[in-house]
């Protein structure tokens, strides 16, 4: 039985990016399970959202989201946290680590944590500082993944990108915004392909994608992750 067979349900049609051609997926809150999950070898599963401070105490909060803890036996699973702020308090870290332990205790092959945060280029150095601290809090056998914006390769200082290489195990560069493919995504790809750390390309299901020949030639390229959506 392949990874996520227990999540299999419903039918889906595809246009543009065909999820059936891939084996790594993001599974987000509110998205119905699709037949392609039966072929998944890697799943990135949303488990929470870290909200920016909105109340009088000025504290960020981790709001649980996503599916209930399943019992998956094969492949790789990453638990994902969508962050709207980097000002995390100790309660957030404790909750994250507790969720990680529960997923593993249920027998799921959790290999790491992914942070989904839209770090603008000029604040990327602050994001790296945050990730360095988070890395020290994770178990030694827990990898760290992040999502990345396409303009990092064009606008970020090389030394900042190099710092990322020493902190995260991979970056998944998103070619979409919201649920739509960025119209000029191809203009960013040459610099993305020159990243000097393991990277994947994130695609929106039903979006647009044409792979340039040079992408697969990068020794750092690790394939694709498809953001599943309801038809």
Model-derived features with residue positions:
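Bacterial N-terminal signal peptides
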Residues: 1-9
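Secreted glycan hydrolases and related glycan-binding modules that recognize and/or cleave
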Residues: 11-231
């Amino acid at each position: 039985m392949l990874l996520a067979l227990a999540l299999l349900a419903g039918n889906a049609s595809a246009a543009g990016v065909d999820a059936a051609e891939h084996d790594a997926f993001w599974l987000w809150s509110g998205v119905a399970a699709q037949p392609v999950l039966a072929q998944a070898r890697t799943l990135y599963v949303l488990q929470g959202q870290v909200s920016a401070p909105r109340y009088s105490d000025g504290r960020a909060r981790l709001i649980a989201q996503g599916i209930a803890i399943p019992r998956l036996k094969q492949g790789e699973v990453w638990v994902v946290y969508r962050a709207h702020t980097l000002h995390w308090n100790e309660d957030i870290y404790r909750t994250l680590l507790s969720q990680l332990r529960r997923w593993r205790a249920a027998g799921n092959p959790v290999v790491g944590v992914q942070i989904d945060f839209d770090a603008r280029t000029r604040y990327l150095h602050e994001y790296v500082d945050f990730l360095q601290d988070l890395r020290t809090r994770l178990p030694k056998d827990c990898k760290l993944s992040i999502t990345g914006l396409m303009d990092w390769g064009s606008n970020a200082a090389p030394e900042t990108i190099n710092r990322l290489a020493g902190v995260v195990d991979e970056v998944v560069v998103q070619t979409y915004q919201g649920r739509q493919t960025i119209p000029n995504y191809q203009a960013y790809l040459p610099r993305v392909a020159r990243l000097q750390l393991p990277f994947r390309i994130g695609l929106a299901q039903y979006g647009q994608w044409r792979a340039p020949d040079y992408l697969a030639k990068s020794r750092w390229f690790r394939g694709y992750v498809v953001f599943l959506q309801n038809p």
